[in-house]
Amino acid sequence: MKSKLIAAVILAIIIAAFAASRFISFKQQKPVETVAPKPQVTIGIILPLSGREGAVGKGLQAAARLAIDDLPKHRLKNEYNFIFKDDEFEPKNTIAAFTRLQHADRANAVITYSAQSGSVINTLAENGKIIQFNVGSAEPAVAKGRYNFVHWTHPDESTREILDHFRRNGFQKVAVITPKISEALAAENAFRQNLPRYPEITAKYYRAKPQEKDFRMLLSFIRNYEPDVILALVSTSRASDIIFQYRASKLPYPLTNVASFGRLDTFAGGEDMFFSDVAPARQELIKRMLSSQPDISTFGAGNIYDAVMLLVEAFEDAPSPQQAVGALEAQRYYEGMAGRAEQDAEGVFHAPSVLKQIKNGRAEIEK
């Protein structure tokens, strides 16, 4: 009987000790810290990944992916989701891609390529309060409105570059060919505004239809004018046409261009021609792109890389994603893969311009 009593007392002591230890352990246990989820920011990137501008679009996509890979994700306050869309360089597809990004993906911003794409969604972006950051457009109207921005070489820089070339070579009479399209007219307007700085140079202007493919008649008129040099402000889609028709005409005056020759898939027929172009990306970015894809286009690579970085920086600096447009507006200068760019009052980040010459089938920067 006594042994049973002792056993019961020992069991009670053990149970009490176990309960006390559990209570103390519970009291000492730290509360579980809950980490608030990061705000979500979605950025759509609409590019021509197929179609006639597909080669350029794939190069831009590769540069954008490198920018995304380079983001210091562990230090960012927002969670970023990047969505690529192929518009095949067709305006209706650009609108459809933007609409899906706006309503299905709830995009906070989009990156677009070219004046064509930037123009067709300019109003949609403005009304939807979605930031559009365009690369590849020299048309100032693409940046119209508070929510529209451009990162590219402005016609003011590119036309001064070509005028400097004319001066160095003693070209005093210039024949300017301008199709009636907004981007070409903007380049001509910049050329006219810069011309007074070069009093020794005069120009005569020749208009072409918006989608003109046959420039032979204009070239015959130019032969009668006998200029020192021809400046063709044609679009990329018509650049090959005028190059081959110029060669066939055997005109003795050099053919030059602003920007569009740089977008050609091939420089066949353009040997020795000069053109001003957007400055290339820094060598470190170009080397990374070419290391995995030796034949990839690097056209505009620095611009789209910097557009990704500028957008992320704006969203990081803003108190909320909805206020990122104000942070982007406040960015006056940016030193990036495209060099030093300055933002003007219209939302255009002016990238540098360079002079290039076609040599051995490649466009090389003229030193």
What are these regions (language model features)?
Residues 2-367:
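Extracytosolic ligand-binding ectodomains
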